[in-house]
From Swiss-Prot:
The keyword Protein biosynthesis does not apply. Structural component of specialized membrane microdomains known as tetraspanin-enriched microdomains (TERMs), which act as platforms for receptor clustering and signaling. Plays an essential role in migrasome formation and migration on retracting fibers at the rear end of migrating cells. Migrasomes are cellular organelles that form as large vesicle-like structures on retraction fibers of migrating cells. Mechanistically, acts as a membrane curvature sensor and participates in stabilizing the migrasome structure in a late stage of biogenesis. It is found in: Cell membrane. GO terms for biological process: protein-containing complex assembly. Residues 1-13, 77-85, 223-238 are cytoplasmic. Residues 35-55, 107-201 are extracellular. This is Tetraspanin-4. Its main location: membrane.
Amino acid sequence: MARACLQAVKYLMFAFNLLFWLGGCGVLGVGIWLAATQGSFATLSSSFPSLSAANLLIITGAFVMAIGFVGCLGAIKENKCLLLTFFLLLLLVFLLEATIAILFFAYTDKIDRYAQQDLKKGLHLYGTQGNVGLTNAWSIIQTDFRCCGVSNYTDWFEVYNATRVPDSCCLEFSESCGLHAPGTWWKAPCYETVKVWLQENLLAVGIFGLCTALVQILGLTFAMTMYCQVVKADTYCA
């Protein structure tokens, strides 16, 4: 009976981790594709220039693949050490995510202030050599969200030391339109505009977060159940 339970949990655990591993492959693939084809689209942050979407996806995908591989191998080999390693790695990720979420909600105001300050510092790198990614990122955001600057279009005045903005701030794009009168520019601040957009899509973000947590809890349950079954089987055989 113990052996039958072990086999059932074993194949469930393997199937779960195979999907987990394939998901990691997908995330890694998207990250590599972004790095190869959209490498010029990088971070908006001046403090964390390597914190681009491509780099985050590559790191996340590789880590998920590694965890999934350990889980698959542990399930097939019925290895207690690998199963426990998988459990601890997944638990560490789960606790890290929970800690980040708690800190984010606890220090929302401070994070808001720091983010705006950092983004304003990043504006001074706009259009400079070696910062094509940041330049393109700002151009895309201002065009798509119909906004200008971090907290106001006047943020750009400090960058240019003149009454002008990038052409991506213009209501109707044309060459050097950023030199025209303020009435021809978007007035909405980009930080608040993007923040409102995220709040409007909070339900989708919440559902994604909940699904991620449930998948991780399921993985933890499978790992610990199989670990216990392997221990029981070893005890029974002994």
